[in-house]
Amino acid sequence: MQFFADTAEIDDIKELAATGLLDGVTTNPSLIHKSGRDFIEVTKEICGITDGPVSAEVVALDHATMMKEADKLRAIADNVCIKVPLTIDGLKTCKALSDDGTMVNVTLCFSANQALLAAKAGATFVSPFVGRHDDNGFNGMELIRDIRTIYDNYAFETEILVASVRHTTHVLEAALIGADVMTAPPKVIMALANHVLTNKGIEGFLKDWEATGQSIL
């Protein structure tokens, strides 16, 4: 499973990249707003930190303007992945971009039917929002399971990029189902390393080591 950081905060991305766990980055208009940075500038900086896909989202709603925005965004760096909404115009844009060799992330997916359309349109990634799905009384992981089954049935190459990840249980469940990628805030990714018994074990080892009076260095 690939790990993408869902953030536009440069320091957080650098910290995660230093661990070797970062495979890519996803951004959206809300994250750009939160960063307080210029969209083009921050996207370019992120692309310089990771060689993996960096999702940058168009904000137009019609195909023609989406294409113009996509042209500007994909000129930033070779690893820019154009993010489009799961609408008919978004799918049309996805098809045009993918036919041209550009990575596309089709976002705001809330049904297996939508995911099927994204794959048919040649999407590199489809982003089902599990947390938001759960918030509205649905089962986000059932959605991931359905998409996995459909994609396996027809050998679609589109990768399932689990988004709106709220906690480490989402990550575990997505991995067990076989999702290709998950994107989450860096704090969620870092939290995967935490376990109370690991901390307790370290404390015990250090206490016993101190009692030996030795030093490795």
UniProtKB/Swiss-Prot annotation:
InterPro entries, per the entry: Aldolase_TIM, TAL/FSA, Transaldolase_3B, Transaldolase_3B/F6P_aldolase, Transaldolase_AS, TSA/FSA_arc/bac
Disulfide bonds: none
Active-site residues annotated for this sequence: 83 (schiff-base intermediate with substrate)
Subcellular location: Cytoplasm
EC number: 2.2.1.2
Enzyme class (EC, first level): transferase
Any one Gene Ontology cellular component term annotated for this protein: cytoplasm
Top-level taxon of origin: Bacteria
Keyword tags: Cytoplasm, Pentose shunt, Schiff base, Transferase
HAMAP family xrefs: Transaldolase_3b
Protein name: Probable transaldolase
Species of provenance: Erythrobacter litoralis (strain HTCC2594)
